[in-house]
Swiss-Prot record:
Top-level class of the enzyme under EC nomenclature: transferase
Keyword Acyltransferase: yes
Annotated GO MF terms: 3-oxoacyl-[acyl-carrier-protein] synthase activity; beta-ketoacyl-acyl-carrier-protein synthase III activity
One Pfam family hit: ACP_syn_III
CDD domains registered for this protein in UniProt: KAS_III
Organism: Listeria monocytogenes serotype 1/2a (strain 10403S)
Membership in a protein family: Belongs to the thiolase-like superfamily. FabH family.
Name of this protein: Beta-ketoacyl-[acyl-carrier-protein] synthase III
Amino acid sequence: MNAGILGVGKYVPEKIVTNFDLEKIMDTSDEWIRTRTGIEERRIARDDEYTHDLAYEAAKVAIKNAGLTPDDIDLFIVATVTQEATFPSVANIIQDRLGAKNAAGMDVEAACAGFTFGVVTAAQFIKTGAYKNIVVVGADKLSKITNWDDRTTAVLFGDGAGAVVMGPVSDDHGLLSFDLGSDGSGGKYLNLDENKKIYMNGREVFRFAVRQMGEASLRVLERAGLEKEDLDLLIPHQANIRIMEASRERLNLPEEKLMKTVHKYGNTSSSSIALALVDAVEEGRIKDNDNVLLVGFGGGLTWGALIIRWGK
């Protein structure tokens, strides 16, 4: 028995903020943003819309798409950096709202790599037989910790949530390999400043991301016994088109094997990879027996990569 994905779901706020909207409030331009990041627009949550609201909506859809009910869920794992409070966890809030009376809940925090950490954690519970059905959510409301006076970072971020239901699948499907890591010495390059707003040293983060995403991708390929050409889809953290393209080139993959959502969502941190995965499923980009590589990096500094063979 292995652990795989049984259903997916997402939620993005209704409000769309384009690059042209940002031109009106800061010294930037659509051309400057697009050429450097690949971002054209992003979703921004309402003031009264919180991370747990985004996570709840995505989880609800994923459970339905898995053909399950909230009573079938054993555990909720939410990857996020924008909890409204230290406790209760976002996972506990959505467990209550969904009426999932049989489930436990916990949050994990590995910034933009958090969703990969959540998926790997869930897989261990399932493979040991401790739990059967686990909801993993990546959700963040980055707009509340964005410094809107810093044009170098304000143009990057958006809000949203993506979710998967994980459960038992056959030995030759599901999670084939993973690589999780941290380099705490780089924490100074990406963190929250004294005003609880995002600070980023873009040059250092770029170097770290390109290096670690590439190396982690090669490690999970080796551990899964796969070659680069065996990959059917690469879903990287949607931070910046240049970083994403560097990841694709490191693996010698054609353009059509790179999943891109950065243009319409921006960088949504913990939900970034999850949203891209859900869109790939909805667009028919993933079929049974496909080998899908998820890879990301985040504040910490952290990184996570994993390969899933789609299907049951």
